[in-house]
C-alpha cells in the first residue's frame, strides 16, 4: 500500500483553535488518522498539468480473449474488473482539498465510486491493425482525466484483425503512480492462471472533512521550516561535490546542453503514439557480449533508432542528444508518497556511426551519470519539491513556454525503462500477449520513449505531439533495425565480464 505522510496525520490544539476561529467546527473523526496526503512530488504532477500537458501514465495491452472463463463478452469483462477493483483501494480513491488547506491535497475514498465512470468501450476501425490501434490510443492519451473522480480510465478496444483479441488501454494520472508503482497497480488486475479467483475485497482509507484536511495541512505547513533547515545544508554539500566532479569530468549530462531537434518545441493538445516489440533474448545477448547493463542496451537502441530517423530527415545533430531518465528509489527512500523517483540526465550519442563504439560510449557515460545521481541522493529532489505549491508551479508553467529553446533545450526526450513481470500473466482472465508502456510529455520535450519487459519480450512505447512529429512509425521501426545492428557487431565481441541485469 502507498505510504501516507505520517507528519500530517495529527493536529495540535493550536491548529484546531486557529480553524475554530475561522468558523470551522466539523468534528474530528478516526478517518483522519488514515488520511493519505499527496507528497510534493505526487502533487507536482497535478500542479504542472495544463491542457497541452496531460500528465498521465498509460499502457496498451493486447489480450487473447480465448482464455477468459466462460468466453469473452464485454459484460463479463466489466464484472471481472468490478471484482478486482474491490481488492485495490487505489482504484477507488479520489482527490480532496479545501481552500483552507496550506499543504498538498489528500486521497480519500470515493463514496460514489462506480466502474461505469471509468470503463469505456470503443470499436477499432478497419482493418484493425497496429496503426488503427495507435490512432485510437493516441487520441485517448491526450484526453484529461476528471479530477472529481478517481484518476484513472480503462478503454476496451474491440474489432481487431483477429476475433479472439481485444486491446485495453489503461490510463492513470502520474500523481497516482510512477512507473514502478504503475506496474504494481496493474498487477492487481492480473493473475498467473486464467481461472484464478478474484482477490478478497480490501477496505479503503476512509475520508476527510474540511477541518481534518485543513488542520493536518496546517501541521505539515508549519513543519516546513524545520525540514528546510536540513535540506539547505544537503543541497550546498551536493553543489560543492558536483563542482569537484565537474573538474574531474565525472558528471552526468548537463541540462540545457542538448542540441535542437524536430521534437523539441511547444506542445499542442493532441498526442500520437507508436510501438514495437523486441525479443529479450536478443537484448540480453547484446548485454552479455558487450559486458554492459540492460539499461545501456536500451539507451543504445534509442540512439540507433533516433540516428536512423534523424538521418532520414536530414537533421542529425553533431552533438549527442540528452535524455532525462527517471530513476526509481522505491527501495532507497523513506519519504512518503506514491512517486518515488529522482531523475538523471544521460547522453544519447546518436551522432556516433559505429554501433559498437556507440554502446561502449553509452555504458561509460551511464556509469558516470548513475554514480553522480547516487551522490546527489535519492531524496533531495523530493525534499525540495515538497515545498512547492500550485501557485509556484502554475507560474512556472506560464513562464516556461516563453523561454526560447531554439539553441539549448533542457533535454531532448524522456527515456524510461520499467522492469516488468517475466511470467505469463492473465488480465481479468485474458492472456496478456503484449504490453506497451506510454509516458507523458513534459516541458518542451515532445518525445517520450518508455520500455517495459513482459514474459521474454520488451515492449517499446513511443509518445509525441503530432504538431512536432506527425508520424512516429519511423522511430518505432528503427528499434528492430538498431537491435539487428547491435547483434551483428556483437558477434565479434568476446563475452563480457560484467553481466548485470539492471
Curated annotation (Swiss-Prot):
Pathway named in the protein's UniProt entry: Glycerolipid metabolism; triacylglycerol biosynthesis
Name of the protein in question: Putative diacyglycerol O-acyltransferase MT1809
Disulfide bond annotation, renumbered to this chain: none
Reaction it catalyzes: an acyl-CoA + a 1,2-diacyl-sn-glycerol = a triacyl-sn-glycerol + CoA
Gene3D superfamilies: Chloramphenicol acetyltransferase-like domain
SUPFAM superfamilies attached to this UniProt entry: CoA-dependent acyltransferases
Organism, scientific name: Mycobacterium tuberculosis (strain CDC 1551 / Oshkosh)
Family under the similarity heading: Belongs to the long-chain O-acyltransferase family.
InterPro entries documented for this protein: Acyl_transf_WS/DGAT, CAT-like_dom_sf, O-acyltransferase_WSD1-like, O-acyltransferase_WSD1_C, O-acyltransferase_WSD1_N
Gene Ontology biological process terms, A to Z: biological process involved in interaction with host; glycerol metabolic process; response to hypoxia; response to nitric oxide; triglyceride biosynthetic process
